[in-house]
């Protein structure tokens, strides 16, 4: 490639530049970090900017995906009426008030509990514990 040859370079999401080699060498000599865009090459199509899969579409279209879609789902769950499983026992209060344990207590009094299998260990423990209090 001779010094005056041109090359096409991709400089970002939107811009294709046509830069001559001489200008590029001058920029390097000056220590220029950012080159000015000399010629915008219109032969190439507009490449997508921002949201990669939506191209240069409207803002409304972009809101239909990604973070906004996730946020709408969260809000929908929060505002959704709760199902039967998540309701409290408010509807059952009347039936719960009628429940009693009288019949069960008449059949098996609390004093006649089943014999324990502690073999006197509880008595030993209480005898050891009482003086410490």
UniProtKB/Swiss-Prot annotation:
Signal peptide: none annotated. GO terms for molecular function: RNA binding. A motif (Nuclear export signal) lies at residues 89-102. Residues 42-65, 103-133 are annotated as: Disordered. The keyword Cell membrane does not apply. A motif (Nuclear localization signal and RNA-binding (RRE)) lies at residues 59-82. Disulfide bonds: none annotated. Residues 51-64 have a biased composition (Basic residues). Residues 13-27 are annotated as: RNA-binding (RRE). GO terms for biological process: mRNA transport. Keywords: Host cytoplasm, Host nucleus, mRNA transport, RNA-binding, Transport. GO terms for cellular component: host cell cytoplasm; host cell nucleolus. It is found in: Host nucleus, Host nucleolus; Host cytoplasm. The RNA-binding motif binds to the RRE present in incompletely spliced viral pre-mRNAs. This region also contains the NLS which mediates nuclear localization. These overlapping functions prevent Rev bound to RRE from undesirable return to the nucleus. When Rev binds the RRE, the NLS becomes masked while the NES remains accessible. Homomultimer; when bound to the RRE. Multimeric assembly is essential for activity. Escorts unspliced or incompletely spliced viral pre-mRNAs (late transcripts) out of the nucleus of infected cells. These pre-mRNAs carry a recognition sequence called Rev responsive element (RRE) located in the env gene, that is not present in fully spliced viral mRNAs (early transcripts). This function is essential since most viral proteins are translated from unspliced or partially spliced pre-mRNAs which cannot exit the nucleus by the pathway used by fully processed cellular mRNAs. This is Protein Rev. It comes from Caprine arthritis encephalitis virus. The gene is rev.
């Amino acid at each position: 490639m001779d010094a005056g040859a041109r090359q096409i370079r991709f400089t970002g999401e939107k811009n294709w530049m046509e830069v001559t080699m001489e200008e590029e060498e001058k920029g390097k000599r000056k220590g220029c970090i950012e080159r000015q865009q000399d010629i915008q090459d219109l032969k190439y199509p507009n490449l997508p900017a921002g949201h990669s899969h939506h191209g240069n579409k409207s803002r409304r279209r972009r809101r239909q995906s990604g973070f906004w879609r996730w946020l709408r789902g969260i809000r929908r769950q929060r505002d959704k009426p709760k199902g039967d499983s998540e309701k409290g026992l408010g509807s059952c209060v009347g039936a719960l008030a009628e429940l009693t344990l009288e019949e069960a207590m008449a059949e098996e009094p609390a004093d006649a509990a089943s014999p324990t299998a502690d073999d006197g260990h509880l008595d030993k423990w209480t005898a050891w514990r009482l003086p410490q209090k």
